[in-house]
Amino acid sequence: MDYKEEFKKINKKLVERYSKLDDSEEFWAYLYKPLRPSIRINTLKGNLKEIKALLEEKFELEPIPWTKGEGFYIKSYDVNYGQLIEYSLGLIIPQEASSMIPPVVLDPKPSEVILDMAAAPGSKTTQMAQYMENEGCIIANDAKRDRANILIANLTRAGVLIAKVTVKDGAYFARYENTFDRVLLDAPCSSVGMIRKNFKFARTWSIGKVYYHSRLQKRLILAAYKSLKPGGVLVYSTCTVDPLENEEVVDFLLQKTDAKLEKVKLPLKTSEPVIEWEGRKYSDEVRKTIRIHPQDNDTEAFYIAKIRKPR
């Protein structure tokens, strides 16, 4: 099958744009391919080894190498989480493998005060609470009330006790200058990575959405950085491939503030960050960020930047 041609039938402009970014056969083939099911074992609710043993009675598990031992692929495409007692009890959290990377990079510690600026549906929030051992505080924010309700349900099922859910425009948190030990901005985006979950993201993609999200992301990342304590860490992430929503947003922050990028070392394959796009030239510092295309690790596309505020 010619996967690029298949995508042209769905959205020709999407293909025209991202062929300039990665025109390999593998890029389009993996973007077409369904995602492998993946879960996190929730140690807030039980012992990792015991829960893993329960799951292995039903499925073959494969460790996800960039997690802290709690992430697994389920080697079966026929998984109905709603029918699993382990899901109902909050012992497992369904979560795409690459979306587990931002909390690993943020590395929150017990007793810290964390801002999750765009938290819903909450899988990353529960992951952070797990790393914090339910000690400290997470402000779990979302701009939309209906999404915040889903967030609350997921936090409750996971046994998260340290999250305070707010419904605010993320830029609101700029008023809390130098407040948070760490901030996660998993930003709203054009969701090209989500095409592997549902082709509607290919059908509904438009360049207008890219421009809209890029403007929003720049507003949010400035607020996120302002709210961060000196010495603190901000992780910026998206599940898309567009440089206007990734490298451009990080480059914008570097130009506007004293932010410093830190190189991330994890056991995963990555694609080269984009230094030049549509006549724009970005700082060489963005080479320290992580760009993941679908074929790199057979996951969603993702982008992650680790940012430090100097003391």
Curated annotation (Swiss-Prot):
Keywords from the UniProt entry: Cytoplasm, Methyltransferase, RNA-binding, S-adenosyl-L-methionine, Transferase, tRNA processing, tRNA-binding
EC supergroup of this enzyme: transferase
Coiled coil: none
Gene3D superfamilies registered for this protein in UniProt: Sun protein, domain 3, Vaccinia Virus protein VP39
A GO term for molecular function: tRNA binding
One of the record's GO cellular component terms: cytoplasm
Residues at the active site: 239 (nucleophile)
Family membership: Belongs to the class I-like SAM-binding methyltransferase superfamily. RsmB/NOP family.
Purpose: Catalyzes AdoMet-dependent formation of m5C in tRNA. In the presence of protein archease, specifically methylates the cytosine at position 49 (m5C49) of tRNA. In the absence of archease, catalyzes the formation of m5C at many locations in tRNAs or rRNAs.
Subunit details: Forms a tripartite complex with archease and tRNA. Binds only the oligomeric forms of the archease.
Family annotation (PANTHER family): 28S RRNA (CYTOSINE(4447)-C(5))-METHYLTRANSFERASE-RELATED (PTHR22807:SF30), NOP2 YEAST -RELATED NOL1/NOP2/FMU SUN DOMAIN-CONTAINING (PTHR22807)
Name listed for the protein in its UniProt record: tRNA (cytosine(49)-C(5))-methyltransferase
